A protein has these predicted regions:
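Conserved binding/recognition cores within well-folded domains
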Residues: 8
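C-terminal structural segments of small proteins and small subunits
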Residues: 57-59, 63-92
Length: 92
């Protein structure tokens, strides 16, 4: 899993039946300070009603995502699993 920031919505009027009624969002990894890591955006399935600008926890592993969906053949491997309200990090 990793932290990411939601950068945008993806509108899809036709998609695989196991993905219907679920939002697709564009996310980019961030570090613990909230700074973007790299320039690569990813598409993530959203089940928790995240929005643009939200900091989220993303699972990127096909079997875990398919288990959450309850559908072992779902064509997805990246999913938003939590909205992050706060990070409390202890400095060494």
């Amino acid at each position: 899993m990793y932290l990411a920031k939601v950068k945008g919505n993806i509108v899809s009027t036709q998609k695989n039946s196991s993905l219907k009624s679920h939002k697709l969002l564009l996310v980019r990894r961030i570090d613990l300070a909230g700074k973007y890591i790299g320039i690569k955006d990813e598409i993530a399935l959203d089940l928790i009603d995240s929005g643009i600008g939200d900091i989220v926890l993303v699972a990127k592993e096909g079997a875990a995502v398919q288990q959450i969906l309850g559908h072992k053949n779902a064509p997805v491997n990246t999913m938003i699993v939590a909205n992050v309200d706060d990070l409390d990090i202890q400095e060494d």
